[in-house]
A protein has these predicted regions:
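Intrinsic disorder/low-complexity segments enriched in polar/small residues
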Residues: 3-9, 290-294
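Membrane-permeabilization and membrane-interfacing ectodomains
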Residues: 32-377
Length: 377
């Protein structure tokens, strides 16, 4: 609060001095006299550093008698703080996320971040593929959505190729919707409707849940960092124009990198034990990172199996509904298909502050309770 008041007080002094100058000189004086881009950008402050932590907050127990024995329950409440280097995208059509886009720092964890709507200077975007091509970057006269989109299309047109079906493979147990959100890199409050609808938990208490993520990154598009603050903006933009979008706790940020590709999120549910589910997942997906092959027979052996899938990118539709064990071959065929570069969708993006180009972490701070109940005869 002290910092915020100080910023406002300085702003009053600047305006007052400008009024005095106008009255005494009786000539047009720029409203931004005495204010620099650096001062405005510094007023936004920096994101407080933090470390990944998982702390046990509370433990309670209860026992409920039933005809066959007692339900003994343990409720554990956890607080988790987690930071990732990139921000995930579950809506490929989000129009404000592209290399070079200026965003308001306080809105980065919103479903759609708020923009800094000032006229931009020129900029350069490039692809990270090393293939001997002489057309891996494009310089645009103004950084804006339409010109950047055309630049990216031009780069892809000159560097298009078929990508082999190589994936990264991750899996973890998720016991609550909050743990699912953490695994997806999202705050619970902004989990997209498609995720809620397609990866909803079974209401049966006997079911165990595993999230499997198969991600294939095609390429990353990067925005060249401008050498000075003024190079971010068109010459017509003044520091006062920028100050409308910057305030203490709301620094100006920009998208430095966007990674494109395809990804499959599988929520695997079964009444089998966690140990059996994990073993089946490891065997089923052991070849997926290299060839995209899925040995569905091991998953099919699980009891009361349900597989819910979201697929983004490639030649697939944006989402799949739940599939049964007998339909796993469809997923197997989809994973094994190679994909063109032009079939990639934005999967994640990296954000930096304009003031000092520091990376901004995707901060997740979630508290949740796990209910673990066992029937004791």
């Amino acid at each position: 609060m002290k910092k915020q008041l100080q910023f406002k007080f300085i702003g009053v002094l600047v305006v007052a001095s400008t009024v005095l100058t106008l009255n005494s000189c009786k000539k047009d004086t720029p409203a931004s006299e005495g204010v620099s881009f650096e001062a405005v950008l510094a007023s936004g402050g920096e994101f407080a550093p933090f470390s990944n932590e998982k702390n046990l907050i509370d433990v309670t127990t209860s026992s409920v008698p039933v005809d066959s024995g007692n339900w003994n329950c343990t409720n554990t409440t956890w607080n988790v703080m987690q930071g990732n280097q990139d921000f995930p995208l579950y809506d490929p059509n989000v129009s404000v996320v592209y290399p070079g886009s200026l965003l308001q720092g306080a809105s980065l964890n919103n479903a759609t971040p708020d923009v800094v709507a000032v006229k931009r200077g020129g900029g350069t975007v490039s692809i990270d593929i090393i293939n001997g091509s002489g057309a891996v970057y494009v310089t645009v006269p103004e950084v804006k959505k339409s010109l950047i989109t055309q630049a990216l299309n031009d780069i892809i047109y000159n560097n298009n190729a078929v990508m082999p079906a190589r994936f990264t493979f991750q899996h973890e147990v998720v016991k609550t919707k909050e743990e699912l959100a953490l695994a997806l890199g999202l705050n619970v409050e902004i989990v997209p409707v498609t995720v809620v609808a397609n990866l909803s938990f079974s209401n049966q208490s006997t079911m165990n849940h595993y999230l499997v993520v198969l991600k294939q990154s095609f390429y990353t598009m990067s925005y060249d960092i401008p050498p000075s603050y003024g190079d971010f903006f068109d010459p017509s933009v003044t520091p006062i124009d920028l100050a409308k979008y910057v305030s203490p706790g709301n620094p100006a940020c920009y998208v430095s990198d966007v990674t494109y590709g395809r990804v499959f999120y599988l929520l695997i549910e079964s009444s089998s034990s966690l140990m059996k589910i994990e073993a089946a997942i490891n065997v089923s997906f052991s070849n997926a990172p290299v060839s995209g092959d899925l040995n569905a027979s091991y998953l099919s052996s699980l009891d009361d199996l349900s597989v819910k899938v979201i697929a983004l990118g490639g030649t697939t539709s944006s989402t799949f509904s739940a599939i049964s064990a007998s339909q796993l071959s469809t997923l197997t065929n989809t994973l094994a298909q190679s994909a063109d570069l032009n079939a990639g969708v934005p999967l994640s993006y990296v954000v930096r502050t304009v003031y000092n180009n520091k990376l901004v972490k995707n901060k997740l701070d979630i508290e949740y309770t796990i209910n673990d109940c066992q029937l004791v005869p």
